[in-house]
Regions:
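Glycan-recognition and catalytic regions of carbohydrate-active enzymes
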Residues: 35
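Extracytoplasmic/periplasm-facing segments of secreted or lipoprotein envelope proteins
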Residues: 39-55
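Extracellular jelly-roll beta-sandwich "head" domains, especially the C-terminal globular C1q domain
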Residues: 1-31, 40-45, 64-74, 81-132
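Short, well-ordered beta-strand segments enriched in hydrophobic/aromatic residues
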Residues: 54-62
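Short low-polarity hydrophobic stretches
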Residues: 56, 76-77
Length: 132
């Protein structure tokens, strides 16, 4: 793990950071509606999920070069929440975006300022309890 910036040595918070502690099977997300992996441009990994210890971990990043649907994937039953989740995430140019994950597994990416979510949406460091 690395921390960057001139103040990183003074304070680097790890609050909210989580990842699977043991090796667990990572599964690719099948992207829909023109959404594509941003791995080639940013080296962030292809969009994927891992279920370990009752927690779902998302990873990778994506963008949507064409199309207008915010729906980008559908999770399998073993990785779905019990209730609708809204989770903040990083989108293009530092804009704050959100993921909506429904009990049926539908995953959507949004942001309030134009089409930043379509330009880039990160799934890194997003996790939630299974059946949450």
């Amino acid at each position: 793990m690395q921390a960057y910036g001139t103040n990183a040595q003074a304070l680097t918070s790890l609050a909210g950071l989580s990842f699977p502690a043991a090796a667990a099977a990572t599964r690719p997300l099948s992207l829909l509606n023109g959404w594509q992996s941003s791995q080639f441009a940013y080296g962030t990994g292809d969009p994927a999920y891992t279920v370990a210890g009752g927690v779902v971990y998302l990873s990778g990043s994506m963008y949507q070069p064409s199309g207008s649907s915010s729906e980008f994937a559908v999770l399998p039953p073993a990785a779905r929440p019990r209730h609708k989740l809204w989770i903040e995430t990083y989108t293009y140019n530092g804009a704050v975006g959100a993921l909506e994950i429904t009990p049926s597994g539908v995953m959507d990416a949004f942001n309030n300022t134009g089409n930043a979510a379509q330009g880039y949406t990160s799934l890194a460091a997003i996790s939630y309890p299974v059946n949450s």
